[in-house]
From Swiss-Prot:
Its EC number is 1.-.-.-. It holds the Pfam family p450. This is Cytochrome P450 monooxygenase ltmJ. Keywords: Glycoprotein, Heme, Iron, Membrane, Metal-binding, Monooxygenase, Oxidoreductase, Transmembrane, Transmembrane helix. The keyword Transmembrane helix applies. The keyword Glycoprotein applies. Glycans are attached at N136. It is a single-pass membrane protein. InterPro entries: Cyt_P450 (IPR001128), Cyt_P450_E_grp-I (IPR002401), Cyt_P450_sf (IPR036396). One of its GO terms (molecular function) is heme binding. Cytochrome P450 monooxygenase; part of the gene clusters that mediates the biosynthesis of lolitrems, indole-diterpene mycotoxins that are potent tremorgens in mammals, and are synthesized by clavicipitaceous fungal endophytes in association with their grass hosts. The geranylgeranyl diphosphate (GGPP) synthase ltmG is proposed to catalyze the first step in lolitrem biosynthesis. LtmG catalyzes a series of iterative condensations of isopentenyl diphosphate (IPP) with dimethylallyl diphosphate (DMAPP), geranyl diphosphate (GPP), and farnesyl diphosphate (FPP), to form GGPP.
């Protein structure tokens, strides 16, 4: 009791002192605290050169803050000096060890017990004090996506066509005259509908309340994620509960819990009363079947986090691809002709979409080129060493436990020694390369979803992104519809946007295009 009284007295005294501080004193105190936090060790045991410091005594907290807005320049400096070895970047999340691609074979197949991808992703996405921290507590939604959704969704691609048509008719307002449309907003609306159809099926894919939950949670979680990245990780536990968006995420989760519980009750009634009822192979059903002990009214958080993760790459990739095509209009007709040839003027190819999509070689090339030229994340294959003994690489370099490693996907894809003409966007680059290298009856090697040592958008090895085929089918379906239904171009007189990154994430600064309907464009899809 005496100790509790002492703590209470100290707390009250601290509050009284804080109330007497002026704004200037508060700001100075915060800066001093940040400087003190910057002295705390990161991956201090791992010896490698740091990059990003403009002068020897630049405060570390300031370097970490600059990384949020100047990460591309810092990474370019590091890659130009140490691309054949390794270097360190300091961030508010952790100190990251950026590795040369020659270490891929050492790490890409190690088990999670030795090299965790989940721990590293949680750190990269905003630390343990963010909505994504759930991934360290529960892998239920990830297992359901990998084991239930991914193997089964393609059996009913016709349903995605139905959902896409519904979205184009109800969510998108494009007329016969040229009209400015934000490509990011367009892709976000389409992806939201289609991803919901994949993750929870019909009729819930059109449940307006669930759609609002998915979008509302995504908006709030994204704000929380980037707000926390501005702060030293030592004070995130204090700030996180004070963010209005943090409270909003919890509100959306509670609403989603109720919606999913009601849907599971409906399914359970059907399962008992309808002898021909078949359980859907979607995310919700997968989570329930994989973990029957979990209360059905406690699945909202898992569902919303997985829904957000599943949408991020398709939304940005779709928008970036449309921008790239608008800036290189010579590729648009090439793609449109290919789509018409594969789908057919009467839409016969829609009857077997899975097979039709494998024939869209030029579209594969354009998607891959956009992902190479402007990857969603500047660094991929984030991993955290979990092995208590650490990990020793092939050349004797030792990675101690706790080391956060990643590979510079952006700069590997832009390295002229690895990719010819790497600084030039060439939409049909991979199509021509496959034509030149392919043997008789050999499938193309440079698909959008096919990773290799020079193309790490989806990672590599044992933990390559399990949802990449879902993303591929979503993107090809949406691109097919846009090419058939609409004309689009870059607005005349608007300068070409510079590539920008915030932290490690692509930040499309200008995505507004001019779009109009094509005559009879909706007759096929």
């Amino acid at each position: 009791m005496a100790f509790a009284s002492l703590l209470h007295h100290i707390w009250n005294h601290a509050v009284d002192c804080a109330e007497q501080l002026t704004w200037w004193q508060t700001i100075v105190s915060f800066i001093i605290f940040c400087i003190m936090c910057s002295w705390l060790p990161g991956n201090g045991e791992m010896r490698a050169p740091f990059v990003g410091y403009r002068w020897p005594f630049e405060p570390t907290f300031w370097v970490r803050m600059r990384f949020i807005f100047q990460s591309l320049g810092m990474m370019t400096e590091g890659y130009s000096k140490f691309k054949d070895s390794m270097f360190k970047i300091t961030t508010n999340d952790a100190d990251w060890l950026v590795l040369s691609q020659r270490y891929l074979d050492d790490l890409q197949s190690l088990p999670a017990e030795r090299l965790s991808h989940t721990d590293a992703l949680v750190t990269m996405w905003g630390s343990s004090h963010s909505p994504f921290a759930l991934l360290n507590k529960s892998d239920l939604s990830s297992r359901a996506l990998r084991d239930v959704v991914a193997p089964n969704y393609a059996k009913d691609l016709d349903s995605l066509v139905d959902e896409l048509r519904y979205s184009l008719e109800h969510d998108i307002d494009i007329q016969d005259d040229w009209k400015p449309i934000d490509a990011l907003e367009l892709s976000s609306k389409l992806v939201l509908r289609i991803s919901q159809r994949i993750l929870i099926g019909w009729p819930m894919s059109r449940d307006q309340e669930l759609l609002e939950c998915a979008q509302g949670y995504a908006d709030a979680a994204t704000v929380v994620q980037f707000a926390l990245k501005l702060l030293p990780r030592q004070i995130r536990p204090l700030v996180y509960p004070l963010l209005p968006q943090a409270w909003a995420t919890k509100s959306w989760i509670r609403r989603c819990d109720k919606i999913l519980a009601k849907e599971m009750q409906r399914r359970q009634v059907l399962e008992k009363s309808d002898p021909v009822y078949e359980k859907p192979k979607d995310l919700l059903q997968g989570m329930v079947d994989l973990e029957p002990s979990r209360p059905v009214d406690k699945l909202g958080h898992d569902f919303l986090v997985q829904a957000l993760i599943s949408r991020m790459a398709p939304v940005v990739t779709m928008a970036q691809t449309l921008v790239d095509l608008a800036l290189h209009p010579e590729d648009i007709e090439e793609l449109r002709d290919e789509v018409l040839q594969v789908i057919g003027p009467d839409g016969a190819g829609l009857g077997n979409l899975r097979q039709s999509f494998t024939k869209l070689d030029k579209m594969d090339s354009v998607l891959r080129e956009s992902a190479r030229f402007t990857p969603l994340s500047m660094m991929t294959m984030h991993r955290r060493v979990q092995d208590a003994k650490g990990i020793t690489l092939h050349d004797g370099v030792h990675l101690p436990r706790g080391t956060h490693v990643a590979f510079p996907a952006y700069h590997i894809g832009r390295d002229p020694k690895l990719v010819s003409g790497a600084d030039i966007y060439d939409g049909l680059r991979w199509y021509r390369k496959d034509l030149g290298e392919a043997q008789e009856n050999e499938a193309p090697k440079h698909r959008f979803v096919t990773p290799d040592s020079n193309y790490l958008t989806f990672g590599s090895g044992k933990y390559v992104c399990p949802g990449r085929f879902i993303a591929e089918h979503m993107l090809k379906l949406m691109m097919t519809a846009v090419l058939l239904r609409y004309e689009f171009k870059w607005p005349p007189g608007v300068p070409v946007p510079e590539q920008q990154y915030r932290h490690v994430f692509a930040y499309p600064s200008k995505t507004t295009l001019l779009i109009k309907r094509r005559k009879d464009g909706d007759q096929i899809l």
